[in-house]
Curated annotation (Swiss-Prot):
Keyword vocabulary terms for this entry: Amino-acid biosynthesis, Cytoplasm, NADP, Oxidoreductase, Proline biosynthesis
Classification lineage: Bacteria, Bacillati, Bacillota, Clostridia, Eubacteriales
Cellular component per GO, a single term: cytoplasm
Gene expressing this chain: proA
UniProt-listed InterPro entries: Ald_DH/histidinol_DH, Ald_DH_C, Ald_DH_N, Aldehyde_DH_dom, G-glutamylP_reductase_CS, Glu-5-SA_DH, GPR_dom
Entry's localization field: Cytoplasm
Single annotated GO MF: glutamate-5-semialdehyde dehydrogenase activity
GO biological process: L-proline biosynthetic process
Enzyme Commission number, as recorded: 1.2.1.41
Residue ranges of the TM segments: none
Keyword Thylakoid in record: no
Protein name as catalogued: Gamma-glutamyl phosphate reductase
Amino acid sequence: MIVYSELSLKGKKAKDAAYKLGSLSSQVKNKALEAMAYALVAQEEEILAANALDMEAGRQKGMSKALLDRLMLNKKRIEEMAEGLYALVSLPDPIGEVKRQWRRPNGLEIGQVRVPLGVVGIIYEARPNVTVDAAGLCLKTGNAVILRGGSEAIRSNMAIVKAISKASEEAGIPEGAIQLVEDSSREVAQQMMTMNEYLDVLIPRGGAGLIQAVVKNATVPVIETGVGNCHIYVDADADLEMAEKIIINAKCQRPGVCNAAESLLVHQDVARKFIPHIGKVLTEMNVELRGCPRTLSLFSGIKEATDEDYATEFLDLILAVKIVDSFDEALEHIRKYSTGHSEAIVTRDYSRAREFTRRVDAAAVYVNASTRFTDGFQFGMGAEIGISTQKLHARGPMGLNELTTIKYVCYGDGQIR
């Protein structure tokens, strides 16, 4: 196990790197991002070989198909990670942006300027793409990053960080700007949670257990990237063909991600027509349905849903289904079980759609669209560092701006108070 002194050394290197990063030009940072993207593709074979070992170990451990999908890399996914870095190059550099500026009666000029957070710590699970996204976003915003990924992806992460850190340093980025903690034990994660001397913020990405452990135990400031117990509500006035497409996309495209749908609510006025149809379609797509008693009466052969099912982020091809008597009952169900991530309504009633967006308390609320769009790249932010479900500092997909803070820069000509 890594000892605290080794982790502290990484922290010191990151702190030193952050000091230098904060004053680098956009040109240097963009050049480094391009070099990192090129290195990912150039070292694809080494990265895929490392990932193959992680995948085999995951199968031996009995990881679910959804979790293995999160872990898996292939040529296309590596190219997508590289494209994410290239996309960051084309985005404006937020560092140095003057958010607002004003002049006081005494002539003092005050400006509110974006600056880096400093050193960002990321604790995450078996998703190698997070390694690239986090490194790229932090570099673009002048932040150093210390990455602690899950043991399931350790070989993949080591290969990725070896490629991108070397490429970035050769392009002018200071050593220590991108570091990986290779010990993925819980003890090391606990140590990171108390590294206030070195870390300016800690961002957990993963399941409920990991996130709650960090929120509960960290003394470092935390931005909580929440669990995604996302709902789709099919209203009485819904276009049912549209609803079918949205549900299939939200549940089946990538069930192991936080913006996938976990619960389906259907208004009783359309349930008799819609439930048997959507039940058949989803069952044929290998989705395990768990329904309320009324759902079971319309589509037999499925499990009865429990309260725990309605509260669960399955991250798998499982969907909890409930028939509701009214729009208000749907909202109450969402209020009770939502994790505040992403919620959707399918309806042709504009006033009801507006009411849904006002009353549902979530980071992203959708009208006639899939919850799968809650994603930094899909929102046009480039990659994302995570999806925040808290309300302080950042909420929703966290792109470049969310990795900055502000500094007040004041110009005078001898003013005293």
